[in-house]
């Protein structure tokens, strides 16, 4: 998997050539290329650029996919709930439904300033990696991992390797983007998360949030 963060790349693969560009991870949709082990890809930087590259073992094959704004599933989650305290923009590129032969699910989430995400707190069996970007270099937030809390800054990363809740929040004034990637287990793919039971009352559309009575 190649995912462009910013800049311009030329990708050469399977007798094809694609030029992908991205000004930043906040204003532009994700662009990148997912390919299997049988495909060779040449990456040429057309200017100063930054991209992420991920790989994992997989015996299955699937068609090479070039991602852009036309084939990324974008959903605003948390809208209209909890006084908009967990509103975020989720950009799913691949999950088990989209490509069951891929053994990774991945995408991006953009936290609006001062908002929470991965909320209500949830957990899952499969390992997950987060890579964070902020719209300003001094931006910061917090990532919860079970009972531990970690400060996150621009280009921080968190590895979720245990079945623990992992909500996160960004400070007021600072937008936060994080790339997330989940590795399926061979006989237990990630198809969704398990909510932390004690917080499920928040899913009631009629729940009262203080100072409501």
Where do the PLM segments sit?
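Extended, compositionally biased flexible segments
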Residues: 1-44
